[in-house]
Amino acid sequence: MKDRKKDRKREYRVFTIADWEREQDYLRKRHGEGWKFTGLTYPGVYHFVRCQPEDVVYQLDYNEEGIKHKDEYVRMFQDCGWEYIQDYAGYSYFRKPV
């Protein structure tokens, strides 16, 4: 039986609102190391699953209007090749292969 704990991990990180670009870089680096971001929970716990290392860019987007019109907002990103992951602290998290 496969050890599922080895295929999942959590990391604690703190990024401020001003650090959104550093956060994107952190998620991209982890994906390149074979850890795909699956979600963020309070307080700053990042969840990952093992994956094939791949160059994937992450986008954190803060848009109050997007939150008000969620379906159209997410569809706009999906039409441009982005995968929606989640919302957290006002930001929407997206990713796509480079």
Task: Place the predicted regions along the sequence by residue.
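Terminus-proximal functional modules
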Residues: 1-98
